[in-house]
Amino acid sequence: MGGKNKKHKAPAAAVVRAAVSASRAKSAEAGIAGEAQSKKPVSRPATAAAAAAGSREPRVKQGPKIYSFNSTNDSSGPANLDKSILKVVINNKLEQRIIGVINEHKKQNNDKGMISGRLTAKKLQDLYMALQAFSFKTKDIEDAMTNTLLYGGDLHSALDWLCLNLSDDALPEGFSQEFEEQQPKSRPKFQSPQIQATISPPLQPKTKTYEEDPKSKPKKEEKNMEVNMKEWILRYAEQQNEEEKNENSKSLEEEEKFDPNERYLHLAAKLLDAKEQAATFKLEKNKQGQKEAQEKIRKFQREMETLEDHPVFNPAMKISHQQNERKKPPVATEGESALNFNLFEKSAAATEEEKDKKKEPHDVRNFDYTARSWTGKSPKQFLIDWVRKNLPKSPNPSFEKVPVGRYWKCRVRVIKSEDDVLVVCPTILTEDGMQAQHLGATLALYRLVKGQSVHQLLPPTYRDVWLEWSDAEKKREELNKMETNKPRDLFIAKLLNKLKQQQQQQQQHSENKRENSEDPEESWENLVSDEDFSALSLESANVEDLEPVRNLFRKLQSTPKYQKLLKERQQLPVFKHRDSIVETLKRHRVVVVAGETGSGKSTQVPHFLLEDLLLNEWEASKCNIVCTQPRRISAVSLANRVCDELGCENGPGGRNSLCGYQIRMESRACESTRLLYCTTGVLLRKLQEDGLLSNVSHVIVDEVHERSVQSDFLLIILKEILQKRSDLHLILMSATVDSEKFSTYFTHCPILRISGRSYPVEVFHLEDIIEETGFVLEKDSEYCQKFLEEEEEVTINVTSKAGGIKKYQEYIPVQTGAHADLNPFYQKYSSRTQHAILYMNPHKINLDLILELLAYLDKSPQFRNIEGAVLIFLPGLAHIQQLYDLLSNDRRFYSERYKVIALHSILSTQDQAAAFTLPPPGVRKIVLATNIAETGITIPDVVFVIDTGRTKENKYHESSQMSSLVETFVSKASALQRQGRAGRVRDGFCFRMYTRERFEGFMDYSVPEILRVPLEELCLHIMKCNLGSPEDFLSKALDPPQLQVISNAMNLLRKIGACELNEPKLTPLGQHLAALPVNVKIGKMLIFGAIFGCLDPVATLAAVMTEKSPFTTPIGRKDEADLAKSALAMADSDHLTIYNAYLGWKKARQEGGYRSEITYCRRNFLNRTSLLTLEDVKQELIKLVKAAGFSSSTTSTSWEGNRASQTLSFQEIALLKAVLVAGLYDNVGKIIYTKSVDVTEKLACIVETAQGKAQVHPSSVNRDLQTHGWLLYQEKIRYARVYLRETTLITPFPVLLFGGDIEVQHRERLLSIDGWIYFQAPVKIAVIFKQLRVLIDSVLRKKLENPKMSLENDKILQIITELIKTENN
């Protein structure tokens, strides 16, 4: 059956359909359109989207030269025009070495991946066809599927394998790697030749005719003819592509059918190319090349022969493949006169001659029917009517009777359009000419209305032959399909069998692994899971021998020190409750002790318990008491006090010491220690190693009323452990009356209430302080708030020299706010006080008023003769430092009459120890403290308390997913606690720096921390301890956090690669992060700093992130400070600028001593205290990383040494930036490049982040940065607009190595990170980065399994380090 039909595609799965579509038309536009069908909708670059849209636009004229990847299917050409999409290129030699490392790693780690149980032969076939559509070779496809599916891979894995393992010249078009100059090509539009020929009908036996070239034509003319033929084919294919693009009315069914004619044209062009190559190789006597070319020729001919048998193939396109047989001159036809040679059709005369030679029998039939048997239209009339209706512009069909001996057949010609003519001629012969015309009309209708049931409207005899043709076509199609797909189906069957066998082995292996799961791990990260609890037998544990400890305690009781302090202990309010406390603990496993501040519960309750366990021996087979404290300073000071009370001479952890302490990075305990004070975090880490606290007999949780995240988390775990351990006792100690909530949480356990030893405290509020001190609030004071101003219009008359009067309208600001706004309560105070109350800024701490108050205490008759310390509550270290400086520079406090002490957890222990010692008579001790002095520690001689009413809380903003340390007002409970600190030794006085009215508006209690902070670290601990999903676990909390907050925390952990995507399970990185008590992002940065040998500088940068920048900006000297910072700027990075300043400070300190150090700090506007703090925190972080098993390598050591005298090299800068990205991702944004018209004009750097646009903060060295690229930022803050603080310009490599979810878009030559960060890259390079991530994960996993393993000579880390350092070189 001949004729030309509309294009169809073969039905297949969606992904295969997309891949076939992508490979059909060899043009950039079609490539993009095809790939787009297989992708989920994601945010794409504007240029790529435009390119995709362009696939439906008409072809444009030749444009300027552009640079793109060498591919006719390359869609990245337009993307290359967008400079904001950065290109990624790797040195060729380094690329080959990296591929070698990747392949070597795969060989060494031959662990089979988990295979999906849903793989079927149909899915494997779809995958095979998808790869085939990309024009990969059959052998390569089979190798890829074998090497990926057996490892749990999919289509993308197979494409990755092919791109990684095939050489560039072996990759199909569209996957080429090299950049080349591309000139857009255009060909003249295809002009259709006039084809008129005798066409073989469908049931004709397959015969091949061979044409011979005239002997007179030379070889050169033959070659030119082949070139013209190839050009004609390409132009024909191009014309079809354009026609296809303009067909907007295609149905889905038509799109899913395969067109053999188009494939045949494509193969014909390739066949001619191969013949030219063969001829060239023959002249060059290149046997190997000639052999390969002949193989290609045979391959193309075999596929073309298969297509010739396709039921919808147009025989007019058929060409001869035989080279060795001479061709006969063709018989001239009408079409040949226009084209000079017949390209696509056989000579009808030649066909007749062959038939005669072979003497094949004719198929003669009688199609006669009577008027009685059929009253409808005849086939001929039906065809004429159909053409008139459906092709109104076409002439009526022509019928040409062809005699064959005494029989007839008919050639029917239907002109569908100027360049589309259908010519058919059945092979069946009839006895008369009219039947031949009806039969020809039936065949024409069969071709024109294929798939429709028109045959039911034809006479029975012609209806039968229609069905005969249809059945023969289906049968042939099935046979061809089976024959073509036989090798593929055989391969898929074998592969599916292997997959099933491996799946069974995996199931058996996992069952064996579960059976052996109780074997102990030789790792410091060994955990006790819920399943292992049943295996722990407490009864069989060795009973502790307490006799030596009891003897030691009896000996200590007889010492003078013990006896002396016993008398002091007996004066404490809690001491008279000793017996009731001990008895209650004997009867109940959980007890709540509610004692007021100063009652002595933190020291005495653990002491009572220890004494009773060691002396009375009440079922005491075990005596190990752990008392948790929220702060390090509390744990240390309480342990010191209890050691003194026990009579231990050598202090906590000393020889024969019964009491010790353990805080982060410091442990003071010995074999005889039976009472351990520790921070809550230390006990949580103990729970990671021993999920049941097997060696602990009593847990005391102090200061539970503070409701920190760690304490609430600890209570959930302890509640579950109590259900599994019948011998564990728990004591909760709270300083507030909110004890019922804790009792209810632990099934209504008993509450012991202990009143504090307190004296009456007189309270003065802000209005009283102003009235008594005579403080005057100046209008220009920084503490005076400015009200909104209203403008009043006035008319001003101005008299000129000539005597004329001009009128001007002016607007004069008028302040709003009046005394009527004050509460009537303040009417009893003076107008000066009322004015100050009205205008004083309540959100700013008035340090001037505090100085006036301190001076007033010494000159007022009411207070000057009262001895006692002054405790001032401030919100943070900055305010402490500021007030300390003011006191030091105020002449009124110069004398030895005053001793000023700053109390903060980051300050030295020696300075803080002075706060607890009594000063000499006549000396006023002034202690500056945060809320640490509220309940955690007790300063014994405090009589005066100055309460600013402010504190700092870490709050989480769900809308922006940002957290910040916010200064806020305290709760009523906290204010009362602060007030109570003044009544410890005598009648006290509390001065509140806020009004009585504001105090009444305070919240009763602070919001629990678990409800207002990010929960990443908490989720890490939950997964580390195998406590199930964080959502389920935290639902058991005293105050469960919102699910959205937990979800945000888990999303962040997934983004940084700390936990698995589909289950609450830690990755190797997450396991290591859980061992570091720091923010997860900083922890990740420290780990990568250690494994890449740059821990020292990274720890310095991490210390800055945990504290604050050392740069200062004095009032009135902003320009000087900015200039000094600019002089230290390095590598477009605020982080490296700070590190550069730190190096200079260390150099000045080492070479010139204190004076040189001070000069350097003043010249560069650096805070020396911040730098000293930074150094201390840095050393502490390094200790933490080493304690987690990451010892510093020789490379890391080289950063330390004499680094202060060196500058950073480009390679070192690249490495540091990469580690910064590893830690701070996904805090990245794309710089919106703005080209300024005026060169001198400085434009603020605008950055597009995942949440929207933001502006670089004015304090950043990148404030005026204008370039194409990406910016890393430390934090995002919102003032009048959103700003990015502490930014660094970064390159693509670190983002590709350490960023979020990476996706390779093979056809577009794009790499996407998290669906919105795009880079241009050849597919091979894209796959390399994807594989390198797997290798990094394997290094971390090995380190987890073997903590002592050295990473210094690891090949993977070495090659990645080299890759990072060589970027842009």
From Swiss-Prot:
Motif DEAH box, chain ranges: 702-705
Residue stretches in coiled coil: 222-256, 283-310, 492-519
Q: What is its main location?
A: cytoplasm
* Keyword Nucleotide-binding set for record: yes
Q: Which organism is it from?
A: Homo sapiens (Human)
> What are the alphabetically sorted keywords of the record?
ATP-binding, Coiled coil, Cytoplasm, Helicase, Hydrolase, Initiation factor, Nucleotide-binding, Phosphoprotein, Protein biosynthesis
Indicate, by first and last residue, each region the UniProt record lists as having compositional bias (Polar residues): 189-201
Q: What is this protein called?
A: ATP-dependent RNA helicase DHX29
Give GO terms: molecular function aspect only: ATP binding; ATP hydrolysis activity; cadherin binding; helicase activity; ribonucleoside triphosphate phosphatase activity; ribosomal small subunit binding; RNA binding; RNA helicase activity
Q: Where does ATP bind?
A: G595, E596, T597, G598, S599, G600, K601, S602
Domain Helicase C-terminal, residue spans:
849-1026
Task: Give the main EC class.
Answer: hydrolase
PANTHER family for this protein: ATP-DEPENDENT RNA HELICASE, ATP-DEPENDENT RNA HELICASE DHX29
Q: What does this protein do?
A: ATP-binding RNA helicase involved in translation initiation. Part of the 43S pre-initiation complex that is required for efficient initiation on mRNAs of higher eukaryotes with structured 5'-UTRs by promoting efficient NTPase-dependent 48S complex formation. Specifically binds to the 40S ribosome near the mRNA entrance. Does not possess a processive helicase activity.
How does this chain assemble? Part of the 43S pre-initiation complex (PIC) that contains at least Met-tRNA, EIF1, EIF1A (EIF1AX or EIF1AY), EIF2S1, EIF2S2, EIF2S3, EIF3A, EIF3B, EIF3C, EIF3D, EIF3E, EIF3F, EIF3G, EIF3H, EIF3I, EIF3J, EIF3K, EIF3L, EIF3M, DHX29 and the 40S ribosomal subunit.
Instruction: Quote the subcellular location field of this record.
Output: Cytoplasm
Q: Which family does it belong to?
A: Belongs to the DEAD box helicase family. DEAH subfamily.
Q: Which domain of life is it from?
A: Eukaryota
- Gene Ontology biological process: formation of translation preinitiation complex; positive regulation of translational initiation; ribosome assembly
Q: Where is the stretch described as Disordered?
A: 27-75, 176-226, 502-526
Pfam families to which the protein is assigned, alphabetical: DEAD (PF00270), DSRM_DHX29 (PF24385), HA2_C (PF21010), HA2_N (PF04408), Helicase_C (PF00271), OB_NTP_bind (PF07717), UBA_DHX29 (PF24899)
Enzyme Commission number, as recorded? 3.6.4.13
